Amino acid sequence: MAKSDVKGINLGMGTGRRKSSVARVYIREGKGDIKINNRDFDSYIQLENLKTIALSPLVLTNTLGKYDLYINIYGGGISGQAGAIRHGIARALFDLDEEYKMVLKSNGFLTRDSRKVERKKFGKKKARKSFQFSKR
């Protein structure tokens, strides 16, 4: 459940994961400031498609610009981090106000994407690719 700080402003928290990235998202009512690891959102994520992925829960719930987000993220690459931010924002919005649950769940934002890189097996070139086979 959402807590409130000293000034009585509602606070929400959500943890998002994708591949090997983990994002802790803190959300509160504000002007729409987004900080990732104490850096501005636009300087941390530069690719437009990753910005769209990361902010999609806010766009879907029409809350872009209504909340301040403070995100701590580590691990993985830029694509996994964008997915982890999306998952964390969705969970934080749900923690803040449960009326967003149906919209977020129907679009799959509350579900953790469990796909990870498959490990390489011995006797193979990659995880599934075999060495070239020669009959003679």
UniProtKB/Swiss-Prot annotation:
Gene3D superfamilies linked? 3.30.230.10
- Give the transmembrane ranges: none
Read off the Pfam families from this record: Ribosomal_S9
Instruction: Spell out the molecular function terms from Gene Ontology.
Output: RNA binding; structural constituent of ribosome
Q: Is Ribosomal protein among the key words of this record?
A: yes
Q: Which gene encodes it?
A: rpsI
Q: Which GO terms describe its biological process?
A: translation
Cite the InterPro entries for this sequence. Answer: Ribosomal_Su5_D2-typ_SF, Ribosomal_uS9, Ribosomal_uS9_bac/plastid, Ribosomal_uS9_CS, Ribsml_uS5_D2-typ_fold_subgr
Recorded hits in HAMAP family, A to Z, give: Ribosomal_uS9_B (MF_00532_B)
Species of origin reads Borrelia turicatae (strain 91E135)
Q: What is this protein called?
A: Small ribosomal subunit protein uS9
What taxonomic ancestry is recorded?
Bacteria, Pseudomonadati, Spirochaetota, Spirochaetia, Spirochaetales
State a GO cellular component annotated for this protein: small ribosomal subunit
The family annotation for this protein states:
Belongs to the universal ribosomal protein uS9 family.
Task: Supply the alphabetized keyword list.
Answer: Ribonucleoprotein, Ribosomal protein
